[in-house]
């Protein structure tokens, strides 16, 4: 089972589950924990191979790596804790996992908050993935990861976000990074399906105005989805919860409270 941490509220029955992206860990939510635990029950988890979710030697060779199995990891924790329904907050690739969870287990999802959401891969990102596939077994993964974070978050005000992600990525093993990287071959058809299907689950997209690779497709998706809305944060990059944490916290806490009432 994944490593997880819970923070229980003395009065609230509302659950909020945080899902980080590739290369990160539950530590990426360090600017959210204090504020959210004042209002809700909070579940933080480390995805497979990330943070303190280290696989056993047996599981390293036997685990299946696809979006459904990784999504099931999350559901396993939720079921173990007997959480019937939760609001889900994700960042970057974590938003893809949340969307997949909502597709497979809609009865478990109260609402979705998608920070730095990935809805479509543009030509630039596809080029990056192609470059990575060629060199993933040759170049140290941390070099590749640094390169990726700089392409996605190139501006000077994105520096803290880059540093946080690289710090967490140092905890990954090379083999784990390669397995997660292989997921890229599955993501395009999955995203295409997500764009075509409106789940009608309340969804708030929180995007930085400088999230150059992913913002355009999210804007189009919001126009097509009947229960979706977009918070656009100007002068902000991909990792909105780190770069503009106060605005992120204020808006998302209010959103979750509204969706819970």
Cite the ranges covered by each PLM segment:
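Alpha/beta-hydrolase fold catalytic core
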Residues: 1-17, 38-41, 79, 84, ...
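Active-site loop/oxyanion-hole signature of alpha/beta-hydrolase fold enzymes
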Residues: 34, 43-89, 250
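Flexible "cap/lid" loop of the alpha/beta hydrolase fold
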Residues: 103, 109-139
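Conserved loop-alpha-helix segment in the C-terminal half of the alpha/beta-hydrolase fold
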Residues: 202-236, 242
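Conserved alpha/beta-hydrolase catalytic His-Asp/Glu region
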Residues: 123-125, 142-197
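Catalytic active-site module of serine/aspartate enzymes centered on a nucleophile-bearing elbow/loop
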Residues: 228-261
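Gly/Ala-rich beta-loop-alpha elbow adjacent to hydrolase catalytic centers
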Residues: 90-94, 98
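Conserved HGGG/HGGXW glycine-rich cap/lid loop of the alpha/beta-hydrolase fold
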Residues: 6-59
């Amino acid at each position: 089972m994944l490593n997880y941490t819970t923070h229980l509220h003395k009065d609230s029955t509302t659950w909020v589950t945080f899902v980080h992206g590739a290369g990160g860990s539950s530590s990426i939510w360090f600017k959210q924990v204090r504020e959210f635990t004042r209002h809700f029950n909070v579940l933080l988890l480390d995805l497979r191979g990330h943070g303190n979710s280290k696989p056993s030697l047996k599981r390293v060779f036997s685990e299946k790596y696809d979006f459904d199995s990784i999504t099931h990891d999350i559901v396993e924790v939720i079921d173990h804790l007997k959480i019937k329904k939760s609001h889900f907050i994700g960042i970057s690739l974590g938003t893809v996992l949340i969307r997949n969870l909502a597709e497979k287990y809609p009865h478990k999802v109260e609402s979705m908050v998608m920070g730095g959401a990935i809805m479509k891969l543009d030509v630039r990102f596809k080029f990056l993935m192609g470059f990575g596939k060629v060199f993933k077994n040759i170049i140290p993964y941390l070099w590749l990861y640094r390169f990726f974070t700089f392409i996605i978050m190139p501006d000077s005000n994105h520096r803290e976000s880059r540093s946080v992600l690289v710090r967490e990525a140092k905890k990954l093993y090379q083999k784990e990074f390669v397995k997660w990287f292989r997921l890229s071959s599955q993501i395009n058809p999955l995203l295409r399906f997500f764009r075509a299907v409106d789940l009608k689950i309340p969804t708030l997209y929180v995007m930085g105005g400088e999230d150059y690779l992913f913002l355009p497709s999210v804007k189009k998706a919001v126009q097509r989805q009947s229960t979706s809305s977009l918070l656009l944060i100007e002068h902000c990059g991909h990792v909105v919860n780190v770069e503009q944490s106060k605005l992120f916290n204020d808006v998302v806490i209010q959103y979750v409270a509204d969706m819970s009432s």
